[in-house]
Amino acid sequence: MKCVLVFTTALCLLSACTGVPQDIEPVTGFDQQRYLGTWYEIARLDHSFEEGLSRVTANYSLNDDGSIKVINRGYNAEEGQWQEADGRAVFVGDSDVGHLKVSFFGPFYASYVVFELDNQYSTAYITGYNRDYLWLMSRTPEVSEEALAAFKARAVAEGFDLTELILVAQ
């Protein structure tokens, strides 16, 4: 019985990691084909898996099984080398909703929620399963001051704490 309880608890915790923060809606009308390609990380709330990285990019392409291949890459100036993480993303529900789960470690998935995406697919606002995760991604290494201000305003309106926001050097 104890094993069943531990397994059930672990399952619940893992499924919580693929949820959506309360009151945040993933975009609808999401077009996977248009989203594929290279994105530059413009701003983020820092986490241990990206700590100290600059020149961060994410590249998305299709795997043979229909899932999305994810290659995240960033430069660690302290170590003087590039770091790369290969992962796999799949839609949590419908493929026209910007809510995916991504794994870099076997069966363990984390939420990837696109909650803002412009019509040209040139900028995207991303969060994880809670408001501790936030990214501004762009098709270009830089965005205008207006685009950055719009991102910050929307993030604050959605309840994100931006005191630890990092502008990523590209």
Residue ranges and their predicted role:
Residues L13-L14:
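Bacterial Sec-type N-terminal signal peptides, specifically the leucine/valine-rich hydrophobic h-region
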Residues C17-Q170:
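A beta-rich soluble binding module of mature secreted/lumenal proteins
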Residues M1-L5:
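Positively charged n-region of N-terminal signal peptides that target proteins for export
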